[in-house]
Amino acid sequence: MLTSPSSSSTYDPFSSNFSPSLTNAFSSSFTIPMGLKLSRRVTRARIFSRKIKDRSTLKVTCRRAHERVVEEEASTMTETKLFKVSSGEVSPLGVSQVDKGINFALFSQNATSVTLCLSLSQSGKDDTDDDGMIELVLDPSVNKTGDTWHICVEDLPLNNVLYGYRVDGPGEWQQGHRFDRSILLLDPYAKLVKGHSSFGDSSQKFAQFYGTYDFESSPFDWGDDYKFPNIPEKDLVIYEMNVRAFTADESSGMDPAIGGSYLGFIEKIPHLQDLGINAVELLPVFEFDELELQRRSNPRDHMVNTWGYSTVNFFAPMSRYASGEGDPIKASKEFKEMVKALHSAGIEVILDVVYNHTNEADDKYPYTTSFRGIDNKVYYMLDPNNQLLNFSGCGNTLNCNHPVVMELILDSLRHWVTEYHVDGFRFDLASVLCRATDGSPLSAPPLIRAIAKDSVLSRCKIIAEPWDCGGLYLVGKFPNWDRWAEWNGMYRDDVRRFIKGDSGMKGSFATRVSGSSDLYQVNQRKPYHGVNFVIAHDGFTLRDLVSYNFKHNEANGEGGNDGCNDNHSWNCGFEGETGDAHIKSLRTRQMKNFHLALMISQGTPMMLMGDEYGHTRYGNNNSYGHDTSLNNFQWKELDAKKQNHFRFFSEVIKFRHSHHVLKHENFLTQGEITWHEDNWDNSESKFLAFTLHDGIGGRDIYVAFNAHDYFVKALIPQPPPGKQWFRVADTNLESPDDFVREGVAGVADTYNVAPFSSILLQSK
């Protein structure tokens, strides 16, 4: 348990015997009391810092009331710095370059003291503590305005300075405070973060997170002909993916220096173009803590949080996704290069953002890195007993609708739009953002409205995951202000159940593929406000959905208690991998059925990375902690499936792009769709057919799904005058006959639709 130093303890900074005792790793740090209480004039502090291995005595001498000179008695001194400091500016929060120097500003409502810690080490090594840190104690009578602490330091380098804060305050845990001056804290507004250098290196699991800055590099060159794709929402096809997992596997053929990095991602953009998607939804790329599980009392050393839902900071790109070592300045530049390359390829960038919790866990497994130690009572939701509320399922819940936290989130979003040119955001567990500071649901959450109405964010796609771990399920009811789209969880469940052959699902399936009007039309929203998906990072992959009835999460080390138990999956007759040709053929059909259903549905489709070749996690439906082939894209598997599985997936996506009847702006009217069904009330009917009418060129589309385990003879309607039907897709056929872009003529008045298969016809 962490405890704060007693507020009654005293020390004499002018005593020759004074030697500060810091329990932080920075054993060589020393403190410079800023003598600003009697004068608002600037002060000078002469600081002799050196790389020490021993404990030398510090001798402090008072020269004037507003000036301190710190001389260090040591056998060797390697560097001398002269700093000039002033009270600083209250805004903006974080670090900024001002006329006088470098300004630092930090919010803390309940802190009683704040100390700025600086390291001028140019080594960039993880053992910065050996290089010593300079500590500047802020005087609240000079360096504080309202609840913001601030100081300006002159003569600092314009980059490669590491910094953090020590914050002290009331020590009463029962009052909701978690102050501990012994911990060096990361600035919540740090735009760049220096963590450990190597992704997943357990030897660095206790490495410090520092803020840093770069005011020296030239602005990134976006290019004179650069432009945003600006793809209409109705035209999006989203590809959910993990930056590291995309190229980390050796099968990617990457140089190890760029495998799993932003630059490695760029090398594989042609694959995304071949597939046909036009938007990537990146699993978290904010600086996150992948080693959180390895610090617990019974650590799971094999677990590395590769999904990234363990946010350390909301402004900085993940430094360990940079090429080579985890350099934050390089990470920022290479992230921009990735965005620029994606935009040049006509692909938008949507970030999966985690504003519902942070990496600081709970009071059982506390790991204070920033918010908790700066002002726990402001940044986190607390119950009436001042204990952490846990609507995120991760131990803490960010206090999103507190004015200060709300502004932090808005500033973060604006930063990613203006600095990194991203096109949109998917908000993880967004129902948390709809809760008041006491955790109660809000019908008109200030944060949700502010995001929707913000002028900087006006062109962005904003997508909610409309549920949380506290039971606030808002699918179809998420506050939207005509802006917010939603992950349509009901689409996932209903489509899974129909395709696998559950009874009584035909009506629900019809509602989902036609745009979920029951969820969105009633609230004056558009079909594209529903993001349709069958598979996402949570849960089974598409291949596992048709290969496993039960989750197999033993490798996670949680005794099978993690991951969802109700997956609406069907193993097609055998649990797991099999060599049975009949079962393998059935599984292939089912995967194609799911993909075809997704791409012909009204709304915005989203698919998961790897499903285009049939990636398996061997039944693990919660693989967040595996930095292995379990999550990594398998490029050799893609090569093996390029001419069949991948080809079908790609062709269906491109077919969607070229047919406006599959992506209506508004909900379908009677003249735009015909249902070929006369027994809607038959709960045992598992066959659905309909025609989408093209009122412009007469290129109607007929689609039929058969979820029975027997053939169904479908009666094919008459084509438009002067047209005939062409078979474009039949998931029962082998490649390349399963999808023929130009179509195959000769479709009769009836069509025998095979068990667990689907067809698509087009009139020409």
Curated annotation (Swiss-Prot):
GO terms for biological process: starch catabolic process. The active site is at D428 (nucleophile), E465 (proton donor). It catalyses: Hydrolysis of (1->6)-alpha-D-glucosidic branch linkages in glycogen, amylopectin and their beta-limit dextrins. It is an enzyme of class 3 (hydrolase). Its EC number is 3.2.1.68. Disruption phenotype: Strong increase of the starch level in leaves at the end of both day and night periods, but no modification in water-soluble polysaccharides content. No alteration of the amylase-to-amylopectin ratio. Residues 1-70 form a transit peptide. Keywords: Carbohydrate metabolism, Chloroplast, Glycosidase, Hydrolase, Plastid, Transit peptide. The keyword Transit peptide applies. It comes from the Eukaryota. GO terms for cellular component: chloroplast; chloroplast starch grain; chloroplast stroma. Pfam families: Alpha-amylase (PF00128), CBM_48 (PF02922), ISOA1-3_C (PF21156). Signal peptide: none annotated. The record marks D538 as: Transition state stabilizer. Belongs to the glycosyl hydrolase 13 family. Involved in starch catabolism. ISA3 removes different branches than ISA1-ISA2, namely short chains that prevent amylopectin crystallization. May be the debranching enzyme required to assist beta-amylases for starch degradation in leaves at night. PANTHER family: GLYCOGEN DEBRANCHING ENZYME. Double mutant shows that ISA3 and PU1 have redundant function for starch degradation. This is Isoamylase 3, chloroplastic. The gene is ISA3.
